[in-house]
Amino acid sequence: MSKENKTTDFGFTQVPWEEKQKKVAGVFHSVAAKYDLMNDLMSFGIHRIWKKQTIAKSGVRKGDNVLDLAGGTGDLAYKFCQMVGQQGKVILSDINSSMLEVGKEKLTNKGCVGNIEYVQANAECLPFPDNYFDCITISFGLRNVTDKDKALASMCRVLKPGGRSLVLEFSKPIIPLLSKVYDEYSFKALPFLGKIITQDAESYKYLAESIRKHPDQQTLKQMMYDAGFDNVEYQNMTGGIVALHIGYKY
């Protein structure tokens, strides 16, 4: 099937392959200004614990080059700036200009300057040299990428030998009762909160649907192997609602 006739998931809807990126962009242009507030409300603040665990597993040291991909408002990038010091460098990258602007303003106001750059880029074709980064993270961003396999391969290409890539993403709950409760919450509470806080229920309906369409833990693990990563492992968080996958490059 040619790309012209190919379709892909946009939540539970099938859309032409080339249209998904535009539709996802519309979602994040809409929610950017209140993204941090909604994250706190939707997860009851637990997203901060998930990100803290990701940072702890990153292995980032002073002098490292770090890519925070689909980095949005910069929660991880801010911590990495502190970890790499002035000898290192952090690149906060996002395909969405609105999210990137919010992240840049937020981190600048926090005093994060001198060792950070902001790059608008598509994860599927990263504009960086081969073997460049010591660590790459993508946090709650992979499920929004049209061609996930291509993005993972691009991440592997720009990762240094000896480096690691971390994918923090919603996944499949491993406790049946939790899965049912989570479905009820996702499909009813999230759009309601979106409507009240951002006047945009549809964007949060998409976000809930995109979580269900994202590959489960084992599938994503195999996708990372196929992309070229070594020794891929994952850790479930909050009963599998979220999983952290780590892939190395040797």
Swiss-Prot record:
Q: Specify the superkingdom.
A: Bacteria
Q: In which pathway does it act?
A: Quinol/quinone metabolism; menaquinone biosynthesis; menaquinol from 1,4-dihydroxy-2-naphthoate: step 2/2; Cofactor biosynthesis; ubiquinone biosynthesis
Catalysed reaction, written as an equation: a 2-demethylmenaquinol + S-adenosyl-L-methionine = a menaquinol + S-adenosyl-L-homocysteine + H(+); a 2-methoxy-6-(all-trans-polyprenyl)benzene-1,4-diol + S-adenosyl-L-methionine = a 5-methoxy-2-methyl-3-(all-trans-polyprenyl)benzene-1,4-diol + S-adenosyl-L-homocysteine + H(+)
Keywords from UniProt, A to Z, are: Menaquinone biosynthesis, Methyltransferase, S-adenosyl-L-methionine, Transferase, Ubiquinone biosynthesis
Care to name a GO molecular-function term for this sequence?
A: 2-methoxy-6-polyprenyl-1,4-benzoquinol methyltransferase activity
Q: Where does S-adenosyl-L-methionine bind?
A: 73, 94, 122-123, 139
Q: Which Pfam families match?
A: Ubie_methyltran
Name the EC number(s).
Answer: 2.1.1.163, 2.1.1.201
Provide the GO biological process annotations.
Answer: aerobic respiration; menaquinone biosynthetic process; methylation
Q: What does this protein do?
A: Methyltransferase required for the conversion of demethylmenaquinol (DMKH2) to menaquinol (MKH2) and the conversion of 2-polyprenyl-6-methoxy-1,4-benzoquinol (DDMQH2) to 2-polyprenyl-3-methyl-6-methoxy-1,4-benzoquinol (DMQH2).
Hey, which family's this protein in?
Belongs to the class I-like SAM-binding methyltransferase superfamily. MenG/UbiE family.
Task: Tell me which HAMAP family the record gives.
Answer: MenG_UbiE_methyltr
Q: What is this protein's record name?
A: Ubiquinone/menaquinone biosynthesis C-methyltransferase UbiE
Task: Look up and give the organism this protein is from.
Answer: Francisella tularensis subsp. tularensis (strain SCHU S4 / Schu 4)
